[in-house]
Each structure stands twice: as structure tokens, then as C-alpha cells.
A protein has these predicted regions:
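Short glycine-/acidic-enriched loop or helix-start segments at secondary-structure transitions
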Residues: 41, 104-105, 132-134, 165, ...
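Rossmann-like adenosine-cofactor binding region
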Residues: 69-149
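Short, glycine/acidic-enriched loop or turn micro-motifs at the edges of active sites
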Residues: 59, 127-131, 223
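Glycine-rich phosphate/diphosphate-binding loop of Rossmann-like nucleotide-binding domains
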Residues: 18, 23-90, 95
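Single conserved hydrophobic/aromatic residue that forms the stacking wall/gate
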Residues: 1-17, 22, 216-233
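Adenosine-phosphate binding glycine-rich loop
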Residues: 18, 127, 132-215
Length: 233
């Protein structure tokens, strides 16, 4: 617990200052990836009155984020030029890149990262998928940070483990409705009536039903595996 608190304090001091020396300007936060992790990072950073930029390849996702956060958020299409511009300007850089079923791409090169301001912070949430920077390596809750090229790196695998009780409660709350549907409706009916649930199915009847795998079989209730099965299966 001490290590977790100490790490949070250390990062916080770098971003907003301490009780003895408060920053005279808002921190600059750059978030790479506008998915679920990126969305929540934006919320927290804006709540800390930071200047926030999110980089994402999807124009549709950027439009959505702008519709939610308005002018408070700087939403920028991700490319090599914009990535370098906003990475090197950041006080806090958050890697929130996820490619389902694959290792995270190395979006951040060492050459770009070394241009960041000394004492800046990099949090690689993608470390569970290998990390999105050439400078990333997995760390632990007991030894969470290291400095590389003058930048403080936080690359802890399984970050929710820092707050195990809270994260377990949140996971239970998120999964309970699906468990109740399975119990009340049975597998086939639950999957048939909930498209999102069906898309989360990975293996069924000896078939791989997740698209990122090569030997993929569609589980779609319309024309896939589930459409060929009796409702009592």
C-alpha cells in the first residue's frame, strides 16, 4: 500500500505540484488512444484542470469524444507528425493503445520519447499487451517506476491490482448482469438476444468465435454457429 501511495504522490507532484510549490500553469496531458481507457483518462485529466490532447486514428471516435467533452478536449488524428508534436509537449503521456488479439504497436519510439521534457511522466496502460513504447518494460506494484531518457515510466502490469477490493467490486458489478442473463435465459437465448454478449463469445462447440483468430466461425444468430443450433443446446 505504501508503494502505491508513494507512486501516486510522486506522479501527482510532477503534474500539479506539492502543497509547498503549486504549478503556475495547467499540466499538459497527451493520451494515445481514445478507447475505454483513453476516455476515462480524459475524464480524470480534465477534472484536474489539465490541457488534454487525445490522439486516435479513428475520425469517428474523435468526433464522438469531441461531442462528449466539447472544447475542453483537443482531439487530433494520430499520425507520425502529430504524435511527435504532442508526445514531446506532454507533462503526462498515457499510452492507451489496444489491438484486440495482438501485441500493442510500438507507437512511441525512443528517439521521440527522449525529446520529452525532463521529469515528465509516461504511463503505459498497454503494458499488458507488451507496451506501446520502445522504452517500456513491465514493472510491479512493489517496484512500479523507473526513469528512461529522463522520463518517469509507470508500466505496471495489471494496474487494477493496485486497488484490488475496488477493482474486484467494479468487475463484479459489470459482469453480474451477464451472469444473471445466463442463469435466467440459458446460453443460446442469452447470446441470441444480446448482440454485444454474442460478440464476446470466444469458443463454442469446438469452434473459435472471435474474429481476431484465423480459424474464425461467426457466432451470429442470423447466419452463424448459433443459427444452426437447437435452442436447448
Amino acid at each position: 500500500f505504501f508503494f502505491k501511495q508513494n507512486t501516486a504522490y510522486e506522479i501527482g507532484v510532477r503534474l500539479v505540484g506539492s502543497e509547498m510549490c503549486i504549478r503556475d500553469s495547467p499540466a499538459t496531458v497527451t493520451i494515445i488512444g481514445g478507447g475505454v481507457v483513453g476516455y476515462n483518462a480524459i475524464e480524470i485529466a480534465l477534472g484536474m484542470q489539465a490541457n488534454v490532447t487525445v490522439l486516435d486514428k479513428s475520425a469517428k471516435r474523435l468526433d464522438y469524444l469531441e461531442s462528449v467533452f466539447g472544447d475542453d478536449l483537443n482531439a487530433v488524428p494520430a499520425n507520425s507528425e502529430s504524435n511527435e508534436t504532442f508526445i514531446t509537449a506532454a507533462d503526462l503521456l498515457i499510452g492507451a493503445v489496444l489491438v484486440p488479439g495482438a501485441s500493442a504497436p510500438k507507437i512511441i519510439s525512443r528517439d521521440v520519447l527522449k525529446k520529452m521534457k525532463p521529469g515528465s511522466v509516461f504511463v503505459d496502460v498497454a503494458i499488458d499487451q507488451g507496451g506501446c513504447s520502445e522504452t517500456s518494460r513491465p514493472t510491479t506494484h512493489s517496484n512500479p517506476t523507473y526513469i528512461e531518457e529522463g522520463v518517469l515510466h509507470y508500466c505496471v502490469s495489471n494496474m487494477p491490482g493496485a486497488v484490488p477490493l475496488t477493482s474486484t467490486y467494479a468487475l463484479n458489478q459489470a459482469t453480474l448482469p451477464y451472469i444473471e442473463d445466463l442463469a435466467n435465459q440459458g446460453l443460446i437465448q442469452a447470446l441470441t438476444e444480446d448482440l454485444g454478449f454474442c460478440q464476446g463469445l470466444s469458443v463454442h462447440q469446438g469452434k473459435i468465435t472471435i474474429k481476431v483468430c484465423l480459424l474464425y466461425t461467426s457466432p451470429s444468430p442470423r447466419d452463424g454457429l448459433l443459427s444452426r443450433m437447437p435452442s436447448s443446446a
